[in-house]
Amino acid sequence: MNITVITPPLVQLNSPYPSGAYLTSFFKNLGHDCRWKDLSIALVYELFSKEGLSRLFELSHESALRLADKAQTDGDENTAFNIRRYLSTKDNWIKWIDDILLILCGKGREKEHQFLFSPFAPRGARMETFLAGLEREPSVDDVRFLASYALADLADYITAVFDSEFSLIRYAEHLTVDERTFAQIEKELESPVMKYFYQKVLEKNFDKEDCPDMVCISIPFAGTFLPALYTARYFKQRFGDKVFVVIGGGFVNTELRDVSEAALGKYINAIS
């Protein structure tokens, strides 16, 4: 049997959820052809890249301007300033984003000093708060923290002007924590990050692939449920009944144990 195991967005970047590795090893030990795709980290690299940020700023520009104007009208000068600063420094963010990720991965040492001290390195509110809190001259020992805050600042921009469901460690968590109908949850499948960025991740990973016999989607937390549904829908739209889609994981075991929503059958074949 040909099996694909998927970790959907979004889980902690610095502590990957291990279920995919365990499941892959389990199936391989049974003699199956199995591979694991961590689409959570894939989405991060898709979004936080030169191409990704260029597209983000293009898609969000008009909305950002409107929200900045509204914030100023409402007397929220700080929000208006921060949103406009993202737009005015977008070229710096785009130029630096690949190096920021390299620094976070411990591979960008030649850029660390420049990222700390260059007047052209991007800055956001979280980064400035961190630097001000040091009460000393920053050093290369601080650079990875600063890079982490850079991603957090970008995430704040995304949440404020582009996709209110986005977070670095979860996506649309409230949709499954609150009491909402499944139809309401389905409407959120077309939210911006899913539509414009996660769809590209799925296409890059699977558009040229043959149909697997089974797709196992691990859902450890509520904040991965909506992307998991989006993933399941992609496979069903592409392969129809030829693919058997299963969901499982911590969230499924605790929150979906007694699920009776018939519409879920459009996306999956089984719950484990």
Briefly describe each language-model feature range.
Residues 2-12:
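Nucleotide-activated donor-dependent transferases that construct or modify glycoconjugates
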Residues 46-106, 120:
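Conserved phosphoryl-transfer catalytic core
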